[in-house]
């Protein structure tokens, strides 16, 4: 795999983490979620990613998204550094345990729809009025299909999720399309305007 190749080539954990920290994240996306957090204190944020813990816990602080804490929960694949410097990834759903029964096309390691449902169940006392889901990959189709009529999906144009919605349909929620992060920021501000 790629991580094993990087390790064989002598790339250190520090070099990999530095590359992760250098990855760009548009300031408008950061402003959009921070504005939502500061003006709507009852908002919960779930980071639902098919990435891994090491990547996420390296990137978030470098973009100012770790403190004050933004995410109520982060659901992703476990990962850790081996003593020899190899980044070891594990599947969120172990290949040795019970598997998900998703028929929408989620990857074997995680059904994002099941994970979203489990999050809502864990926080059932919150009685969410609306879920706003921001996604772009084809693996975001399953949770978007589970959203209801009061929910909104912010879908990045010309990506896997937009293609699946167009080709397969079956979505009950409102879909708002965006291309650049500034559009996502505008949509967030329109949907949840900052309090005066």
Predicted regions and their residues:
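C-terminal cap/substrate-recognition subdomain and adjoining C-terminal extension
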Residues: 30-34, 38-46, 51-196
